[in-house]
Amino acid sequence: MKALEVLFWISLFIVFYTYIGYGILLYILVKIKECFRKPAPRPMPADDALPPLTLFIAAYNEEDVVDEKMHNCLELDYPADKLRILWVTDGSNDHTNERLSHWPQAIVLHQPQRQGKTAALNRGIHFVETPLVVFTDANTHLNREALREIVHAFTDPKVGCVAGEKRIAVQSKDNAASGGEGLYWKYESTLKALDARLYSAVGAAGELFAVRRELFEEMQTDTLLDDFILSLRIVMQGHTIAYCANAYAVESGSADMREEEKRKVRIAAGGLQSIWRLRPLLNPFRYGTFCFQYISHRVLRWSLTHILLFLLLPLNTILIFTTSTPLLYAIIWLLQALFYLMGSWGYYLSMKHIKNKILFIPYYFLFMNVNVIRGFNYLHKRKGNASGAWEKARRA
């Protein structure tokens, strides 16, 4: 049974490292680095030094939020003569284009065929003439200083992409979907900030990120995580991804856990797809520190850890009856059983619309990992589908 014991402890270590250990190690490495070399402060560019930029919004049937989004765009603290607002509304068959026609500041590209968001990005980028392009979603609200903060990050010539912060608007009445997603993004934002301080953030969220126009590489139209693929291909070109917490996008959480499940399964499938398409980044001799960050922060989560997580309990059960130290394994088994029990209780309460943050954590954690497994099936079903179109989750 030595082999099973070794497998158990390796699995336990990988699960711990993926979700907790990497964050701890990352924090230590950042502190060590900054003891020897602190980043030099860069001044905020004056108005006359601000570059022209394009705010790029790929939208499909967003009639309900068009006016609110345009109001938000025009309220941003950036010179109007240096800001272009580009909408790509391919496939939209509601009143999105009609509403946009009332806004002379909006440049609208539309074709009747819906080919997915990635195809819309590939098409729209040819109409971008500014050195910087900021991508954002139609249903998100940007803070007033977002564009200036993003431009500030680009004053470092090594930075090829800037990731803004994603925030979930959570109200007391919200369900487990909003509460769980909000907690997840707070943790994820902390990791991104530490990643960027060590070397580079590992990806950007599509709600708000920006790239240098010259570094944009067209993607396969069946790409599921366009924001992730696009940002990491910029790293492959020798640039870094800066993280800017002072530029943030706020959106509502998913309407319910069924809608959140759609998102998580698609993201998991997109993660698996991304690992294959970004496989050169797995070369530590070429990408060094970033390879370590990429594997620790993303690859393990999407490829291996969820399998090992659910393998731990049956392995643990076997080891209780087959090793010379059954008490140790019995204690670990009880801790696992308690965690699963709390997750199940959290699920029950969410069905009753009763909010309990303590129980939402194990529930949402297990929910995410179950949907990573479902991502394999989602990706298999899409095999041969050249379109990146997907059913978007309803927001609260």
Language-model regions, residue ranges each:
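A conserved acidic beta->alpha catalytic loop
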Residues: T54, N72, L86-N97, Q113, ...
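Long helical/loop segments within the catalytic core of UDP-sugar-dependent glycosyltransferases
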Residues: V30, H110, A119-A120, T130, ...
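Short, acidic, metal-binding catalytic loop of nucleotide-sugar glycosyltransferases
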Residues: H71-K82
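Cell-envelope/extracellular polymer assembly enzymes that use nucleotide-activated donors
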Residues: P51-T54, R84, I229
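Short aromatic/hydrophobic "clamp" motif used to bind/position activated sugar donors
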Residues: V133
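Juxtamembrane C-terminal module of membrane proteins
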Residues: I20, L25-P52, R258-E259, P280-F290, ...
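Acidic helix N-cap motif at the loop->helix transition within catalytic regions
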Residues: D64-E68, K82, N93-H102, E145
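Catalytic donor/gating beta->alpha subdomain of glycosyltransferases that bind UDP-sugars
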Residues: F154-Y187, D222-D226, S231-H297, V370, ...
